[in-house]
Regions:
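Short, hydrophobic/aromatic-rich segments at coil-to-beta transitions
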Residues: 30-39, 58-64, 78-87, 110-113
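Edge beta-strand at a domain terminus
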Residues: 118-144
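Tryptophan-anchored aromatic micro-motifs
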Residues: 30-50, 112-117, 136, 140-142
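Contiguous, well-ordered beta-strand patches that form the walls/edges
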Residues: 67-111, 144
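Amphipathic hydrophobic-ligand
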Residues: 47, 93-102, 130-137
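Secretory targeting and sorting signals
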Residues: 1-28
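Extracytoplasmic/secretory-pathway segments with low complexity and glycosylation-like composition
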Residues: 2-3, 30, 42-45, 89-95, ...
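N-terminal glycine/threonine-rich, aromatic-flanked beta-hairpin/loop signature
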Residues: 45-83, 118-119, 123
């Protein structure tokens, strides 16, 4: 005959086995950005604001139109961050000739806080290629 203590022990063991056998709750996939988002960035004393409009292109892909600096850019979800890497051009501040640049942009899939880095691909004036032209922290906020 099993006493009260035996029943409690058996109950505890069954509960433990059940808990161990239960798979962890799956985390929901981050929301794919869609529609307009407010973009704000602080770079030294200057602040920048714009609207980025996202169009999903898959479960881990979204394209953005964001003023002249970032058009038709595809972001891909990687390790909890939306990431984009591409090329563009800007005027060399020394002689005002077109200067090819690389752009690396990423933001956290949950907080929407991100970083943007632009670097030169060719020399500009006396500066070497590969110099960082700008690095900004930014925040996206879903509009509407």
């Amino acid at each position: 005959m099993i006493g009260i203590t035996g029943k409690r022990t058996a109950s505890a063991v069954c509960g433990l086995l059940f808990a161990l056998g239960t798979p962890p709750a799956a985390q929901a996939a981050p929301e794919v950005p869609s529609g307009p988002y407010a973009f704000t960035a602080q770079h030294g004393p200057s602040q920048r604001a714009a609207t980025w409009t996202f169009t999903p292109c898959g479960a881990t892909c979204t394209a953005v139109d964001a003023e002249r600096w970032l058009q038709n850019a595809e972001f891909h979800l990687n390790g909890g961050r939306w990431e984009y890497s591409g090329r563009g051009s800007m005027d060399c501040p020394v002689d005002h000739t077109p200067l090819p640049v690389s752009k690396t942009v990423s933001f956290d899939a949950v907080t929407l806080a991100g970083q943007w880095t632009t670097a030169t691909l060719e020399p500009c004036g006396r500066g070497p290629a590969g110099g960082v032209v700008g690095q900004w922290d930014f925040q996206l906020t879903k509009a509407g």
